[in-house]
Amino acid sequence: MDDEAGHLKAAFGDSSDGEDFADRPENRSLGIGDSTVWERVEEINGLWLCRNFLSIHHQSDLLSAILNEGWFVEETINQAMRFGDLPSWATELCDLILETVESVDLSVLPADLLWREPLFDQLIVNLYQPGEGICAHVDLLRFEDGIAIVSLESPCVMRFSPAEADEAEDVDVLLSPGSLILMSGEARYQWKHEINRKENGFQVWQGEEINQKRRISITLRKLCQA
């Protein structure tokens, strides 16, 4: 527990007061208002980024809720998966994503996805130590359209590359702490995504090396019906 508290303090100072993420009333209105800014990644249809999805306080509460699950107590474990009934904080996060998407007059997700219930029912939490990444992949077809990724603690560059060889160039997107990226349509099915650390184990953004520390990502998806 001391290690968890240390990680929280290192990431957010003393902003975490121990209150559960799902219990904070302000979380229920997150994303509603002028502060939410969605950016469409022009090169890839269906790829949207919300850099300010979670405030510092929201990030701290969410990180605390994840660490309290006890998934990463052993250093050899760096991934946790859940299917069906998700933890309350994850269900709340799904609701916040839906609220944020619906709060803007933009086609951030296809309309038919917004009507499905639940929006997401599968969760992956990945813990990346400095220098770690994930190879290029397209998510399995056992999952429906629409994938959400929330980033915590440390920034990283996610690289998108065409799933089939063509003349399209790779596209890099900076995922900052508290950001939300959504993939649907072409972005979900026709582009691979990765966190590439093959060169010296670190990443560079706009000519500057990223100060990479521990990073936690939350991926939300919807299983296809049998």
Question: How does the language model describe each region?
Answer:
Residues 1-226:
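Non-heme Fe(II) oxygenase metal-center motifs and adjacent flexible, charged/small-residue loops
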